[in-house]
Amino acid sequence: MKIRQQRTIEKNICKKMILLSFCMILMVSMAGCGNKRKENLTITNVSYDPTREFYEKYNKDFIKYYKDKYGKKVEVIQSHGGSGSQARSVVEGSNGDVVTLALEHDISLIEQTGLINKGWQKRFSNDSAPYTSMIVFLVRKGNKKSIKDWKDLIKKGVEVITPDPKSSGGACWNFLAAYGYAIDTYHDQKKEEQFLTKLYQNVSVMDSGARGSTTTFVENKKGDVLIAWENEAIQTVKNYPDKYEIITPSISILAQPSVSLVDDNVKVNGTKKIATEYLKYLYSDKAQKLAAEEGYRPSNETILKQYQGKFNLNMKLYKISDFGGWDQAYKKYFEDGALFDKIYTNQ
């Protein structure tokens, strides 16, 4: 009886040792898999419409930089669309590690959900705006409608193309640039709003994003003038030098696209280090020069001056602070029932 019990005990001990050995092998195997995943880090950049070409080139530079510095291979997935729509996609569960959106307000909407930490604007230089732009007009070669300034956009028979401020960050900048001109010209709120009403009465197609509006104007041949990001207009003229030209209005606005980590996502994904490096590298000299070559205005003033032949650095530019900052401006002009809705529903 004792011998039988002893054998049973030995069998149980043997089973436990086998089970323990199996668990240890499994843990080592899983650790090995984890290391492999770390060797091929993947992040997703949720961005707005016209940045596609810039980030395609930037990502290649960054991947090389990260490999040279850390010896690790990185993959960057790009996602593009209207800035407001992209912000909502992150709020609704899109697994972006970083957001590079058209305006601060879109990132603040994500911040309000707790996905992005408060104070994100101060995480990187220049209020987390590594590059800027402004708003210009793109017309067909020859400029048959003689469009020279904002006042020409309200003429009878002029068809204007601009995206929808409800989904496009660029469209919000377009609206505010036009409003800046109206403020300087009329000095009367009623007349300013009448000007904006006439302008939007001339809008024939209103796409959901800036790239969609460019496609409508360039590929579908709709409209006489496109209100556009300066960088988008520069790229279009570069691609079609004999078909389009840029008109710089007398007054525009300093458009500041913003960038941020999506803090909750990078924590879950284990990508905080790579995502932080990704955004920091936007401020490197190489990335700043690339931004300039792609039509964006570098935040580095020294590098910006090197491209002064490409950009008009002496024109009057309104700033978002002139409209009370984004929180105030969005409530006043773009929320449901605000000024844009009143203007657009009066048509």
Can you describe what each PLM-predicted range is?
Residues 129-136, 196-200, 207-208, 239-272:
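Periplasmic-binding protein-like
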Residues 266-347:
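Extracellular/periplasmic juxtamembrane helices and adjacent flexible linkers that interface
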Residues 3-20:
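Bacterial N-terminal signal peptides that target proteins for export
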Residues 46-48, 139-141, 158-185, 199-203, ...:
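Short beta-strand->loop
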Residues 28-32:
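C-terminal motif of bacterial Sec signal peptides marking the signal peptidase cleavage site
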Residues 37-167, 314, 344-345:
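N-terminal segment of the mature folded domain
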Residues 185-250:
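Ligand-binding pocket segment of bilobal, Venus flytrap-like solute-binding proteins
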Residues 142-148, 167, 180-188, 265-273:
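Short helix-loop capping/hinge motifs at secondary-structure junctions, enriched
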